């Protein structure tokens, strides 16, 4: 049987994909088949038994009362700050660059506090994946809902630009309960068992619809139909960083995807923050609609970076300082790590 080869298929791997497609037809969105395994391991494969044990442990932890979760998170965070030295050095480097006014002792304490906040955030996420979130949705302090109403009056969907604060999955239902048609952008976990656990836990609440970076077109359609999508885009994506804008006065690599999404879908863009307050309560803040968002990607990045910075300055331990936020550097700039 002859195989027609398009001119666009110029590489051997692409040609092999065509041959495999004729010999072994498959369904689904598959490409570059020669670079993938012929079949995925089933979730009960022995390679995933460790992940299943972890899921079982997390499920058991979800039954702990929230007060005990918070106390355990404090103990666990302090322990990890001493054991995970490489991540502690990353957090220290981030804080030294962003808050040079802090002395060494204060910065060291803030590193430990960031570990504690992150550990508590994991346990809060476990609660959100398996337990009832209604009491927290009802008791959380929420500000700026009128901006969501304004977007609705304009007949627009909403792109909610967020950040990686310590309450992350726990915050998803707190945000979604204020939305009529919620969705979110996410990066699938490399371990399929862990990914299934996380996604199942997220989708329990309010019919939230997930989108990956490979589902941009469906997400644009969802937004055009009045959907409201949460996108935490404040991490350093390495070579995918397209612009550099100030974050705490340091040039930070940013993607321009939010600008593209806003421009193509015509949505209203609103920044959102979600914090655990010192008294143990939770707070969600929606910003006013960011007018003209999507026209100038660099300016857009400055807007959402500025919003995140203002939030972090209020509760500095609540940010994910353990992430290498300044991994990408502008040409000629000194490395931070």
Language-model-detected regions and their locations in the chain:
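Membrane-anchoring hydrophobic helices of lipid-metabolizing enzymes
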Residues: 12, 28-162, 195-199
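Catalytic core of membrane glycerolipid acyltransferases/transacylases, capturing the structured
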Residues: 154-213, 236-246
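Intrinsic, low-complexity polybasic segments
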Residues: 18-19
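Non-catalytic C-terminal accessory region of glycerolipid acyltransferases
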Residues: 28-29, 33-45, 74-76, 80, ...
């Amino acid at each position: 049987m002859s195989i027609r080869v398009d001119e666009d298929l110029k590489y051997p791997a692409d040609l092999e994909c065509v041959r495999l497609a004729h010999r072994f037809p498959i369904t689904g969105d598959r490409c570059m088949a020669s670079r993938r395994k012929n079949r995925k391991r089933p979730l009960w494969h022995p390679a995933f038994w460790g992940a299943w044990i972890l899921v079982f442990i997390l499920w058991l932890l979800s039954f702990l009362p929230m007060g005990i979760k918070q106390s355990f998170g404090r103990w666990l965070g302090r322990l990890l700050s001493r054991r995970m030295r490489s991540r502690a050095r990353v957090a220290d480097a981030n804080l030294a660059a962003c808050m040079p006014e802090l002395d060494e002792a204060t910065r060291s304490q803030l590193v430990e506090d960031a570990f504690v906040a992150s550990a508590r955030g994991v346990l809060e996420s476990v609660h959100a994946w398996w337990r009832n979130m209604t009491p927290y949705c009802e008791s959380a302090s929420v500000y700026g809902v009128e901006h969501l109403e304004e977007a609705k009056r304009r007949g627009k969907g909403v792109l909610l630009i967020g950040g990686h604060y310590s309450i992350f999955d726990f915050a998803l239902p707190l945000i979604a309960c204020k939305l009529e048609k919620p969705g979110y952008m996410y990066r699938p976990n490399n371990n399929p068992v862990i990914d299934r656990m996380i996604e199942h836990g997220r989708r329990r609440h309010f019919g939230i619809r997930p989108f990956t970076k490979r589902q941009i077109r469906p997400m644009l359609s969802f937004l055009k139909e009045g959907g409201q999508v949460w996108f935490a885009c404040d991490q350093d994506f390495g070579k995918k960083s397209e612009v550099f804008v100030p974050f705490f006065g340091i040039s930070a690599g940013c993607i321009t995807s939010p600008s593209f999404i806003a421009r193509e879908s015509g949505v209203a863009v609103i920044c959102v923050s979600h914090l655990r307050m010192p008294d143990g309560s939770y707070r969600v803040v929606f910003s006013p609609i960011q007018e003209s968002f999507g026209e100038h990607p660099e300016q857009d990045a400055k807007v959402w970076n500025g919003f995140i910075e203002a939030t972090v300055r209020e509760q500095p331990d609540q940010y994910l300082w353990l992430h290498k936020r300044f991994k990408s550097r502008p040409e000629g700039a000194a490395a931070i790590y």
